[in-house]
């Protein structure tokens, strides 16, 4: 019988162990998409207790606490940090088979050298040991420990990026660090014309860009202005979230009329919304191509399903789910149209619905180019798919339909500084898959060859992809 989560956790063959210990675990981390707060990095934040670093803002854990009958007071309410910690510890034993069960134990092991099984009997021991370690742990210590080479934060076009500037000039409180912290351009609020605060947001964009946004052309100009600003501060990537993929072409005059209706807070129908989004996305794709920015597209998240709780707590609090729309046909038209209008940038496609992996992977193969290796990427298993089964499925589908060796690998997509252990989780799974292939004679048992593929997926590919 194997020991629970020992050093060979998830490594079920000797080749996998060799690949992990000699190659994967030595690689730096290129975390090209996350939701870390750059202010906390700049200020070299020190966390007051394990609840703050483990549970604050982590809606993955919040969902499971609710499912386990924990009152909201102990999740997002005014209970003490200790009581919230106890509520989470009571939840964990019921999560067997859930990735949070593995992640939570891995976080305790790697950050705090705590190897106890999480349960109520061990709660006070874990609380005391972790808090003792946190007295001498800052963000800078975490980034150094996990060899974090690059952090790509997620930023609104109106952000002034003051903390990115301070960090990369070595003038922030954190001082000079090995880690590069770069902004990513996420214009969702300028795309989502149907939102009630759209016109207010455009005024904010107007102030940030110092461009009078009076029509669709000046809106495009303002967005391009902010892309240039982001680029000047090291931005290498954009991102957008699409619950459904729009495609409905119309002439610029009609798009301008739709935009002006929205600015006057007039109601828009679905056709108006789709036409506007199609137009703006094509304009952004063109600019990303010209600016050599990677475009990340996150598709099929159905957000804020529970209106009662959305009104109480706002977005990103655990009330999103997997969407189930047919994305491929319209995505094909969108890519085809943008490609005809100057070409496509490098694009990473993510879907929250795993049924889209085969269609996405084969569609992106239609837009690969000989000049750039792996120009189009099937993104790592995301959010609800970000578990062992989901990672294995994404890796194998990519291998079956494309070039796994060119994959840009894992990202945290997280708000927590404890999430770097997820890179280890992914790396173990990757090494186990390739090791199993080697042990079965399906690929050459050439450790140097396989090791180079592991190193490339874990770090080298992303470093080249985002920096060339």
Curated annotation (Swiss-Prot):
Catalytic activity of the protein: D-glucuronate = D-fructuronate; aldehydo-D-galacturonate = keto-D-tagaturonate
GO BP term, pick one: D-galacturonate catabolic process
Enzyme class, UniProt record, top EC level: isomerase
Record flagged with keyword Transferase: no
EC number(s) reported in the record: 5.3.1.12
Sorted UniProt keywords: Isomerase
Cross-referenced HAMAP family: UxaC (MF_00675)
Name of the protein in question: Uronate isomerase
Lineage: Bacteria, Pseudomonadati, Spirochaetota, Spirochaetia, Brachyspirales
Gene name for this UniProt entry: uxaC
């Amino acid at each position: 019988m194997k020991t629970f989560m020992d050093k060979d956790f998830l490594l079920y063959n000797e080749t996998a162990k060799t690949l992990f210990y000699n190659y994967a675990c030595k690689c730096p981390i290129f975390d090209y998409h996350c939701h870390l707060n750059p202010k906390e990095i700049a200020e070299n934040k020190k966390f007051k207790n394990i609840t703050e670093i483990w549970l604050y803002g982590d809606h993955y854990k919040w969902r499971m606490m609710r499912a386990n009958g924990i009152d909201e007071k102990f999740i997002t309410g005014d209970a003490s940090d200790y009581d919230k910690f106890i509520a989470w510890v009571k939840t964990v034993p019921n999560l067997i088979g859930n990735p949070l069960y593995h992640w939570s134990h891995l976080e305790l092991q790697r950050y705090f050298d705590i190897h106890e099984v999480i349960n109520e009997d061990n709660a006070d021991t874990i609380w005391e040991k972790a808090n003792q370690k946190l007295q001498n742990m800052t963000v800078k210590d975490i980034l150094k420990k996990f060899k974090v080479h690059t952090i790509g934060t997620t930023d609104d076009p109106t952000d002034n990026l003051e903390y990115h500037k301070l960090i990369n000039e070595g003038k922030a409180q954190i001082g000079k660090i090995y880690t590069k912290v770069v902004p990513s351009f996420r214009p969702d609020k300028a795309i989502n014309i149907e939102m009630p605060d759209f016109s207010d947001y455009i005024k904010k964009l107007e102030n940030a860009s110092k461009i009078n946004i009076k029509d669709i052309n000046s809106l495009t100009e303002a967005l391009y202005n902010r892309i240039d600003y982001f680029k000047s501060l090291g931005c290498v990537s954009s991102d957008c979230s699409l619950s459904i993929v729009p495609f409905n072409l119309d002439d610029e005059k009609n798009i301008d009329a739709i935009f002006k209706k929205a600015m006057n807070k007039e109601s828009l129908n679905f056709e108006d919304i789709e036409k506007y989004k199609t137009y703006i996305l094509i304009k952004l794709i063109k600019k990303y191509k010209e600016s050599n920015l990677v475009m990340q597209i996150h598709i099929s998240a159905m957000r804020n399903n529970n209106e009662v709780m959305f009104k109480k707590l706002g977005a990103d609090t655990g009330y999103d789910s997997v969407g189930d729309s047919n994305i491929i046909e319209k995505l094909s038209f969108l890519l085809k149209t943008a490609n005809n209008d100057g070409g496509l940038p490098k694009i990473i496609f993510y879907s929250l619905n795993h049924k889209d992996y085969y269609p996405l992977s084969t569609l992106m193969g239609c837009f690969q180019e000989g000049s750039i290796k792996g120009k189009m990427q099937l993104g790592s298993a995301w959010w609800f798919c970000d578990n062992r089964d989901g990672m294995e499925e994404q890796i194998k589908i990519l291998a079956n339909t494309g070039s796994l060796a060119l994959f840009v690998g894992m990202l945290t997509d997280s708000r927590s500084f404890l999430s770097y252990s997820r890179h280890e989780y992914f790396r173990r799974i990757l090494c186990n898959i390739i090791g199993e292939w080697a042990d079965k004679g399906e690929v050459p048992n050439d450790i140097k060859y396989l090791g180079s593929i592991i190193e490339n997926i874990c770090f080298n590919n992303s470093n080249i992809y985002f920096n060339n």
